[in-house]
Amino acid sequence: MRRILLTFLIFLVSLKIFGQTELRQELENIIATKNATIGISIKNIETKDTLSINGTLNAPLMSIFKFHIALATLNLVDKGKLSLKQKIFIKKEELHENTWSPIRDEYPNGNMYLTLDQLLRYTVSHSDNNGCDILLKLIGGTETVQLFINKQGIKDFTIKLNEREMQTWESFYINSTTPLATTEILEIFYKGQVLKKKTTKYLYQIMVDCSRGITWMKAGLPEGTELAHRTGISDRNENNLRAAMNDVGIFKIPNGNHIILSVYLKNITEEREVTEKTIADIAKATWNYYTNK
């Protein structure tokens, strides 16, 4: 009986390894011909099944850091130092031109109030760069975020610059992390180990409401799939090189499991449409693997 059980367990392990090998091969085929350095980290939260390719790639964060900033902000909400209902005065001079800012577009004259809830939604759901910097100023700067993320046990994470300070090519590479570190923070966030239950649910939902990157990871998943994610993208330099394009998040599959997918592309010379499709294809392959097991 013991021998039969052992044989069965070996069979199950072999099936898992074979399946992962198939997914790994498909992902490697997707990224093999791309003119970019690509890092991928995947984890099924419920089964703990993991896979990574270049998971330790040190990659520019870009606007992915708005997730980490939101975590640090909501930690202060949990502690009672901030409230989602509190009003924050937005000065006109804080609404900088020549940057992505739905707040500025909607309130071009500034000098008005937004609640912290509104500011977080603009920043996380709609990637507002001015909103991001206003949040950072409110919570004490990048140092607050760095210390908080490190306190969660995440070591491969660096944040030193706000959006306004990321104006030069070299500056794009200063704020950085790895696919594996991103998957790790997303997992403990989802499990409620970073924030209280109410603020965890709140942040997850405003990530589901993300309006950016519709043709990226989201395009590789079936319509209607629950996806909580954040995107990040840099400009190009004079040599048509893009420093980074990233999409990280958690999606729910039909059996109720949740899959973390962290995709970072670095030093890209492909056209944007090609890079978007690469991320979508990675998401599609991951979805197919976990829904056909």
Language model features with spans:
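Conserved catalytic neighborhood of penicillin-recognizing serine enzymes
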Residues: L95-D133
